[in-house]
Amino acid sequence: GRDITWDQYCKWNLPIRHVVEDILNEYEGDRECADFQNFTVYAKRLFFANGIHHHYSEDKFFPECPKEYFQSLMEAVGDGEQATELLEVIYSPDIYPQRRSTSKTGDIVELSAVNFYDGVTREEVDKYYNSMMDPNDKTPISYGLNTKVVKEDGKVVEKPWKVGGIYGPALEKICAELEKAAAVAETDLQKEAIGKLVEYYRTGDLKTWDDFNIDWVQDTVGTIDFINGFIEDYDDPLGRKATWEGYVNMKDSAASARTEVLSANAQWFEDNSPVDPRFRKPHVKGVSAKVVDGITL
């Protein structure tokens, strides 16, 4: 799943990461000089951000070592044939300056580095999805959540992220691991939910995705919980495409019990809050919450 996220952030991320990894693993030259130290800082920033753009600002960051030095490192580990193409992406401030464009004047689809669209404009994408939507549908699917939009023979089309499609080999491995998890599921509902998630990955059917999420949100009694899929859409300038993520957690029973006590006494905290009594609410209700420990991310 990690490589899916890297590729979704920018189509150049994986080729650049592979070159950087080659240099870190194989370079036999001077590693103590200032230029190599600056290269190392760039590598760490790259790994932390899952690509060439800052994790929060989404602006591209740059190595502080000279371009010529970076090229010499690539040549030293046998990656010199990629230097011209990749170094232009790495060093040019004009190529993919933002992961998700916030331009108020340009086409934010064309200007964004994210790998959700290729060869299409915002107007074309909006028109494509508007033609699909039924205003009378009270339970619409999340149109375009798990696809890349491209143009083929002059026509706008979707390429699904599913087994047999884009990211197929990686998703096949994810399905295999999910099937192992289903075999040891804590509850029948959890097992059913995992089965629907696997079906969704294999078909790309967004109605199945909705069905999985309904089961997932209703499964509240287990100790183990997870997030897995193309879920959050804030990396897309149009707020439509979702980035893949995977996370497993375990309920902390002791901490959750303390949280329940706090929630049950919400009115006491409100009545004794250090604010002017005029601003205290006469009736408050605690929330339903649990405390978890992350296992994998």
Language-model region placement:
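Generic detection of intrinsically disordered/low-complexity segments and helix-coil linkers/edges
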Residues: E85, I90, E110-L111, D137, ...
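Intrinsically disordered, low-complexity linker/terminal regions across diverse proteins
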Residues: T223, N228-L297
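Non-catalytic architectural context of zinc metalloproteases
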Residues: D134-G154, E158-L171, G204-A254
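N-terminal helix-rich structural modules
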Residues: G1-A183
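Short, charged, amphipathic alpha-helical segments
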Residues: K191-K196
